[in-house]
Structures are given as C-alpha cells and as structure tokens.
C-alpha cells in the first residue's frame, strides 16, 4: 500500500508535508521564511501554520493560524504555476480566538 503522505521539509525552520491523494499541503514555519517546491511556493513574514488545498489554475484555499497568538498580521505570498498572490492575514482578535485559524480563497 502506497503512503500518500510525502515529507517535503523537516528542519528547524520549516516542516512541510503533502497528501498526494488529496493534494493538500501543510507547512509549519518556525520563523519567517519561504517554502519552495516545484509546484508551490509560500513566503511568510512571521511564524505560522498553514494548509493549502483545492489548488487549481484560478484559485486555492489557504488556512492559516498563529499558534504564538501574537495578535499581529501575517503577510503571505502564495505562488502556484508562476502565478502569485499576496495577502495579509489579520490576527488582531484576543481571548479564546487569539491566533485562531483564518480561511482565505486566493485568486491566482
């Protein structure tokens, strides 16, 4: 039986995996940086956890969380098939929603 989980990065800065059957990408950034793969590139300006799914030629769904609960915005640049789009994830909420996952549909 083939394992659908592919480990793409596993170091002190970035951990990244992909479910090849579902085409879901999961990336943990322990600091600001860029994850690059031939199919996907993601750059962030702060530590965060994100998932990219439902990728097609026109859009992708991005889910992003701030486990550090910094209440600061996180800048994200997503690049797929030479198309790129930038967004700012707002993490200004406090209390039980501090750092909670945000969902964005990214138009490419």
Where are the model-predicted features located?
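Terminal accessory/anchoring regions of large secretory-pathway or extracellular enzymes
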Residues: 1-108
